A protein has these predicted regions:
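Basic/aromatic-rich interaction segments and small domains that mediate binding to polyanionic partners
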Residues: 2-84
Length: 84
C-alpha cells in the first residue's frame, strides 16, 4: 500500500467467517468493557473467526474476531491478523 493509498480503497483482506490467527498480543486499549486498560485480551497465536468488518477513522478496516477459547469478540487491524 502506498502512502497516498487508503486501506479502504481496497476490498477487505479477510472475509466474514474466515478463520484467522493473531500475529501479536492484544491488550485492552480502553474500548473493551469490563477489563482494565492494558489487560491481555488475547495472545499471539490464538485463533478465531471474523464475525464483522467495520472501519476506523475512514482509513482502515477493523475486523471483529471471535476468539472462541476466551469467549471474546475483539477488534483487530489487518497487521494484527493472518489467515489460518
Amino acid at each position: 500500500m502506498q502512502l497516498d493509498e487508503l486501506e479502504l480503497d481496497l476490498p477487505p483482506v479477510f472475509e466474514l467467517e474466515q478463520k484467522v490467527r493473531l500475529r501479536k498480543l492484544i491488550r485492552n486499549d480502553g474500548t473493551f468493557p469490563g477489563k482494565d486498560i492494558g489487560e491481555t485480551l488475547a495472545k499471539k497465536g490464538e485463533e478465531g473467526y471474523v464475525v464483522g468488518i467495520g472501519t476506523y477513522l475512514q482509513t482502515s478496516y477493523i475486523y471483529a474476531v471471535h476468539i472462541i477459547e476466551r469467549g471474546y469478540i475483539i477488534g483487530c487491524r489487518k497487521k494484527e491478523l493472518e489467515a489460518c
